[in-house]
């Protein structure tokens, strides 16, 4: 198995010198046996080709190095086993808590804070080893915490965000329904009816990440009184009428646990209604913030696939040579790196716009669509490098290949992203 480790100069979170030397020696010896000249040293995989990580300040770079150390020393050794078992690695939560990355991009309330650029780099690092683990964190930190941060009352923020920032309470985000995905803005079938100081919720939510085991759910429902979308905080384990069934037999994002939520006369106090979440526009504020984070995750997915493919090409011998020495293989690797670099540059600028308060729905939509589409290309080329070995998880690339398909679809399909952009640039709405 080829571990996913990159030795970028500023990262160098894990000492890989002995493994590098061993790989180079093995290739050299094999090639000398065939009387083939071999370079003294092979370049280490570097998926930050334009050194964009250098745009981070020293404190941010230090945190990203810590995240990489966690993913390479803790996550990488166990992820294939958990992925194969459709299970979540709860054993890693204590080490994840030690990183103190809860609440990235959110200020106050015990949150880590920091720039959206830093948040993006962290999401990219997590996805570089496993996109489904990064999805777990993105749902909690971006969607669940973001909903309370943007749409909650001061009291709700004080109550929930500190616990969530410490990863003591984990959240999920319930918008998608069995028959409602792209049409959520005007088509939610989950309803909310107010009865005094209580709301009665009925309906179903599907594909909800973290739902089978998390502590609280952000549920979006249509108010029967005014037909507007309202947001609610539901405490999963203590709310009657709330139930979750784990979705089984997934072929992608197998580590993040997705659930089918059923709400049957589920009674939620008014105190748990998101006080500033009174229409889908308020929901969209959260999605705007998190949607382009999927672009960072898709880019991390590409990075992991590319780095695995490059290492493999340097040590796999065919016709007496490393396959990385063949023109067709170098063409694939160069195209992969170009995709990654294009996505990184786009996302870096988008993070700057977000930090400046200039991020728009169309900005987020363009990046989400573009980066996830490029990810599908990149991981397909990476799998091609491995040949038959690319369809087993031992070599990691099969996970990236499968997960890229899910990233392409969730938080808004590619086609819906293009319609958002199309409306912005033409002035015409093509939505049905």
Question: Where are the predicted features?
Answer:
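Alpha-helical interface subdomain recognition
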Residues: 7-128, 139, 152-156, 163, ...
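N-terminal glycine-rich flavin-associated loop
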Residues: 135-155, 184
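A short, Trp-centered hydrophobic/proline-enriched beta-strand micro-motif
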Residues: 167-176
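Conserved hydrophobic/aromatic beta-strand scaffold that supports enzyme active sites
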Residues: 172, 189-191, 216-220, 231-233, ...
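Short Gly/Pro-enriched turn/cap motifs at secondary-structure boundaries
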Residues: 179-183, 207-210, 222-223, 250-257
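Flexible, small-/acidic-enriched active-site or ligand-binding loops
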Residues: 187, 239-267
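A short core secondary-structure module
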Residues: 202-244
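A short, charged helix-loop
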Residues: 259-283
């Amino acid at each position: 198995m080829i571990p996913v480790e990159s030795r970028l100069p500023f990262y160098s979170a894990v000492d890989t010198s002995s493994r590098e030397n061993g790989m180079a020696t093995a290739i050299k010896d094999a090639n000398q046996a065939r009387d083939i000249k071999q370079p003294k040293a092979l370049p280490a995989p570097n998926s930050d080709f334009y050194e964009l990580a250098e745009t981070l300040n020293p404190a941010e770079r230090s945190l990203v190095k810590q995240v990489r150390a966690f993913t390479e020393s803790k996550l990488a050794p166990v992820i294939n086993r958990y992925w194969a078992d459709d299970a979540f690695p709860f054993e890693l939560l204590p080490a994840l808590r030690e990183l103190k990355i809860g609440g990235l991009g959110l200020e106050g309330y015990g949150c880590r804070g920091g720039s959206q650029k830093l948040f993006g780099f962290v999401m990219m690092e997590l996805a570089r080893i496993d996109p489904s683990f990064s999805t777990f964190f993105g749902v909690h930190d971006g969607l669940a915490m973001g909903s309370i941060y943007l749409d909650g009352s001061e009291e709700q923020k004080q109550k929930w965000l500190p616990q969530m920032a410490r990863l003591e309470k984990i959240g999920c985000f319930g918008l998608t329904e069995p028959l409602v995905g792209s049409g959520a803005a005007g088509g939610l079938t989950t309803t909310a009816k107010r009865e005094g100081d209580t709301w009665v919720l009925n309906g179903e939510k599907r594909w909800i990440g973290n739902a089978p085991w998390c502590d609280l759910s952000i549920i979006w429902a249509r108010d029967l009184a005014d037909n507007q979308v309202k947001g609610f905080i539901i405490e999963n384990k203590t709310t009657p009428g709330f139930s979750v069934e784990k979705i089984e037999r997934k072929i992608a994002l197998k580590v993040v646990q997705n659930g089918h939520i059923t709400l049957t006369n589920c009674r939620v106090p008014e105190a748990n209604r998101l006080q500033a979440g009174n229409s889908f526009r308020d929901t969209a504020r959260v999605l705007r913030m998190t949607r382009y984070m999927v672009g960072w995750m898709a880019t991390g997915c590409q990075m992991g696939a590319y780095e695995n493919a490059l290492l493999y090409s340097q040590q796999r011998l065919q016709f007496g040579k490393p396959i990385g020495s063949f023109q067709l293989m170098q063409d694939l690797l160069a195209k992969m790196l170009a995709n990654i670099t294009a996505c990184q540059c786009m996302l870096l600028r988008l993070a700057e716009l977000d930090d400046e308060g200039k991020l728009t729905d169309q900005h987020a939509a363009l990046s989400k669509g573009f980066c996830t589409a490029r990810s599908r290309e990149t991981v397909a080329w990476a799998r091609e490098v491995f040949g038959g070995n690319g369809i087993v998880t031992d070599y990691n690339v099969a996970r990236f290949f499968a997960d890229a398909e899910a990233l392409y679809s969730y938080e808004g399909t590619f086609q819906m992203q293009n319609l958002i952009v199309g409306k912005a640039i033409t002035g015409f709405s093509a939505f049905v």
